[in-house]
């Protein structure tokens, strides 16, 4: 199907916006707040439903929502996409500040959990990184995963190191005991066998 001719959009228009690497996403043409940086020529400020992210896109990457709802409005497994479809239908006036309020609430919850032990808090911190990473774009998510694995490995190494040293000493001592006992046990077996032979020869 041929692309539609680029057209003029105004603030508040509902569209599907296409960015490289992402499906056609439910979005809204935003108005520029006073004092904001002006977008490049022929670019519109876009607010993406579901993720509440913003970008500047040209008219060739924008598709009117009503005309393309049947084509692009199918549910998708990408995080935030289905929420975006719901928002564009039920709450098209949602503002970016709503997302910031959610972030502030989650950061205050994080501060309130400071009384946990070191191991428990590091595990929970790793979970938080993963949850936060799901809402981010693909390249940012990879960085979060690295952080998570790095912190969890670091904490597990520290927790293994102190008890592990004692365990290693205990294991070595037990090995020495068992090897010396094993030698005696082997001698005992030989003695027992020779004793049996002597006994059988004597009878």
Curated annotation (Swiss-Prot):
SUPFAM superfamilies in alphabetical order: Tudor/PWWP/MBT
Keywords for this protein: Growth factor, Nucleus, Phosphoprotein
UniProt note on tissues of expression: Detected in testis, heart, spinal cord and brain.
Nucleus listed as a keyword: yes
Gene3D superfamilies: 2.30.30.140
Superkingdom field: Eukaryota
Chain residue ranges for the region called Disordered: 97-203
Basic residues bias spans: 135-160
Phosphoserine carried by residues: 121-122, 162
CDD domains cross-referenced by the UniProt entry: PWWP_HDGFL3
SMART domains: PWWP (SM00293)
Compartments where found: Nucleus
Function description: Enhances DNA synthesis and may play a role in cell proliferation.
Name by which UniProt lists this protein: Hepatoma-derived growth factor-related protein 3
Source organism (scientific name): Homo sapiens (Human)
Gene: HDGFL3
